[in-house]
């Protein structure tokens, strides 16, 4: 989930499917947001305007609330009213965080790429620099995140989500 704030100070909460790590130094992640009929989504508009956002990792405990944020609301309406999420102040950005998220990243806009197909812009790729991160103490052990404790959910396409499944550990060659 991404929280962002509009120029009118409306808190926007939105799910996203296309999210990845770009680099650890500097810590940058990417988020790709599809356009709807060529128009910027509210999240994209907000981030391009404020240069800030907060990324939250969805887990088994909050996936149903996260799904509610996919509602198509008019500009100026907040998805928060559809959820049981609790907004809390962030430390490094002016965008509220969601208390219930076990992992969240406070980010600033590092770069923006308009992705074109046949001359039309179909998506916006945002490169977001992590300024602060928060990891719940009960899922962080000996410098590692406990994947079972996190119980992360992945947003797929349409109505589908997936849980992180079976892990395979393979030693790397020296």
Predicted regions and their residues:
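Basic, polyanion-binding surface patches
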Residues: 1-174
């Amino acid at each position: 989930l991404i929280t962002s704030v509009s120029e009118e100070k409306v808190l926007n909460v939105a799910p996203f499917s296309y999210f990845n790590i770009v680099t650890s130094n500097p810590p940058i992640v990417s988020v790709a947001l599809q356009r709807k009929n060529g128009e910027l989504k509210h999240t994209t508009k907000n981030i391009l305007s404020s240069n800030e956002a907060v990324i939250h990792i969805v887990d088994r405990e909050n996936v149903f609330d996260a799904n509610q944020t996919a509602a198509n609301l008019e500009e100026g309406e907040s998805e928060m009213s559809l959820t049981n999420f609790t907004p809390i102040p962030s430390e490094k950005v002016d965008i509220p965080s969601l208390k219930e998220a076990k992992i969240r990243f406070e980010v600033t806009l590092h770069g923006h790429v308009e992705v074109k197909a046949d001359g039309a812009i179909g998506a916006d790729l945002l490169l977001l620099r992590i300024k602060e991160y928060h990891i719940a103490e009960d899922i962080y052990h000996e410098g590692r995140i406990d994947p079972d404790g996190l119980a992360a959910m992945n947003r797929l396409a349409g109505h589908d989500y997936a849980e992180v499944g079976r892990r395979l550990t393979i030693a790397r060659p020296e």
